[in-house]
Amino acid sequence: MKALLIRDLRLATRAGGGFGLALAFFLIVCTLVPFGVGPEGGTLSRIAPGILWVGALLSCLLSLDRIFALDFEDGSLDLLATAPLPLEGAVAIKALAHWLVTGLPLALSAPVFGLLLHLPGPAYPWLVASLLLGTPALSMLGAFGAAVTVGLRRGGLLLSLLVLPLYVPTLIFGAEAVRRGAAGADPMTALVFLAAITLATLALAPFAAAAALRVNLR
């Protein structure tokens, strides 16, 4: 399992799907928003929680199609399906690698991007906490979508259409936690729901993704 994780981390960085791409896209989103809505600090601070979460969500979406695509092309996916390690475990490892390359760097760098959007000071710890809780669900749901669309031509578009609706609950509670933190209210309720979504996703999505892979490998 450790060897598979290290291999996937190396592949992610070498194949152009590393954290640099996700961070660059996140920066572009946070930079362009003030041009669209105006530079007024009050307006930006009100919409900052939602914009930051949408930016993180879209940044995670960029490299989802690579989770299984390279292994499918070189035949490694067939070997994983017949390896002693259960396919569900391999799916979980690949989702973890995706999160380490995209979700974790986004969560840790989000306060810097929050400055660009005049995010209120009290919201910063809740921004990081919500992203640390929510982005694992994004990676795991993305792994499920990648498993369903692996091997399809132009599967990236279908992957986006499949995964984005599944991201909505995480987006709602993640942005709400940051919004409550910015207003000085208690964000714990939103964080509890966010954690519940992530735990449910981590428990169920590997089995769904493994089943989809077995169907596509027949």
From Swiss-Prot:
Keywords, alphabetical: Cell inner membrane, Cell membrane, Cytochrome c-type biogenesis, Membrane, Transmembrane, Transmembrane helix, Transport
Cellular localisation: Cell inner membrane
Superkingdom of origin: Bacteria
Keyword Ribonucleoprotein attached: no
Regions that span the bilayer: 17-37, 50-70, 99-119, 126-146, 155-175, 190-210
Major place of residence: membrane
Annotated membrane topology: Multi-pass membrane protein
Pfam families for this protein: CcmB
GO molecular function, one term: heme transmembrane transporter activity
Annotated GO biological process: cytochrome c biosynthetic process; cytochrome complex assembly
GO CC entries: plasma membrane
Family: Belongs to the CcmB/CycW/HelB family.
Protein role: Required for the export of heme to the periplasm for the biogenesis of c-type cytochromes.
Official protein name in the record: Heme exporter protein B
